[in-house]
Amino acid sequence: MALLDPHYPLGRHNTFRFEAAARYAAHVRAAQDIAEALTDPRARGLPVLVLGGGSNIVLTRDFDGLVLLMEIPGVQVGRATLDGRAVHTVTAGAGESWHGLVARTVADGLPGLENLALIPGTVGAAPIQNIGAYGVEIKDRFHSLRAYDRHAGEFVTLDAADCAFGYRDSLFKRAGADRYVIAEVTFALPVDWQPDTHYAELARELAARDIAAPAAQDIFDAVVAIRRRKLPDPAEIGNAGSFFKNPIVDTATRDALLARFPGLVGYAQPDGSYKLAAGWMIDQCGFKGRQSGAVGVYDKQALVLVHRGGGSAVQLMTLAREIQDTVHARFGVRIEPEPVVI
């Protein structure tokens, strides 16, 4: 049963480690706890915030509402046919560690998620952000999810089309933001798995390891090594991973920028557009390694903003806006934050 805790501190529940508090919080350890918490008379009419690992949120203030702390455990494996192909289905509770799930599936001989290793957070948050890394996104491995529909007052199952996935985007960041609370997610991992190593940085890492025909474990190990070199451990330095999305532009914009900036880093997309490396642009503007009081830009990866303790989310967002404005002034491209800002 979900009990509401008043005046609940959230410092331990966000990876930036910013201090904030919720009017009420409920530890959700089973699907039915969602409905119980939401129908508690004390929560009636209050805004609701769902928190998993807190790795994709910036808390700039106290939250005057109900926070659902998602802790639903459990992993189940099965088989199914999806679009005419055989898949392993892996259903995980929203509170399961994302990296823990990836490590478990790879170790159990269920490849498909290895490119997404070491991304912080929980399973329930993964489809909201359509997390992605090294050439693979959640949408590529998604089967369905079960969520509580706050409008209907019941649990529903949503497939990939329902979720309307986009680049670091989904239904749950738009029209469904205040409607659905994800309880569990089912992934479809191909039985006829083939390694996805087209991402240049991953290919270089595998080549450096003299691995020409990688197994899923090889890709997992390579991704973990790359991420550990580039990204700070949230347990040591407050951060939310990549803070800015890589902007997507049309071919004409990319060509015009390339003429002015020959070193521009960009990646062709299937629809003919280009995804530009926001980290490269931030670095070119001189922000990499810059510290502004207790917040700053990580010295090994310009996409990452950090909080070294004792600072505030307001300071962080001031720095973020300065970076956005400077990049826009120089390149004419607007970069947008990945985390949700409260």
Curated annotation (Swiss-Prot):
Which residues of this protein are catalytic? 168, 242, 338
UniProt keywords (A-Z) are:
Cell cycle, Cell division, Cell shape, Cell wall biogenesis/degradation, Cytoplasm, FAD, Flavoprotein, NADP, Oxidoreductase, Peptidoglycan synthesis
Domain FAD-binding PCMH-type, residue spans = 17-192
Q: What does this protein do?
A: Cell wall formation.
- Family, per the entry? Belongs to the MurB family.
Q: Which cysteines are joined by disulfide bonds?
A: none
Natural source organism? Ralstonia nicotianae (strain ATCC BAA-1114 / GMI1000) (Ralstonia solanacearum)
Pathway(s) it belongs to: Cell wall biogenesis; peptidoglycan biosynthesis
Q: Give the gene name.
A: murB
Q: PROSITE patterns under this entry?
A: FAD_PCMH (PS51387)
Quote the protein name from its UniProt record: UDP-N-acetylenolpyruvoylglucosamine reductase
List the lineage, top down.
Bacteria, Pseudomonadati, Pseudomonadota, Betaproteobacteria, Burkholderiales
Q: Name one GO molecular function term.
A: UDP-N-acetylmuramate dehydrogenase activity
* Entries under InterPro entries matching the protein: FAD-bd_PCMH (IPR016166), FAD-bd_PCMH-like_sf (IPR036318), FAD-bd_PCMH_sub1 (IPR016167), FAD-bd_PCMH_sub2 (IPR016169), MurB (IPR003170), MurB_C (IPR011601), MurB_C_sf (IPR036635), Oxid_FAD_bind_N (IPR006094)
Q: In the Enzyme Commission scheme, what number(s) does this protein have?
A: 1.3.1.98
In terms of one coarse class, where is the protein primarily found?
cytoplasm
* GO annotations of cellular component type: cytosol
Catalytic reactions on record: UDP-N-acetyl-alpha-D-muramate + NADP(+) = UDP-N-acetyl-3-O-(1-carboxyvinyl)-alpha-D-glucosamine + NADPH + H(+)
Q: Where in the cell is it found?
A: Cytoplasm
Tell me any Pfam family this protein matches.
FAD_binding_4
Return one Gene Ontology term, BP aspect.
Answer: regulation of cell shape
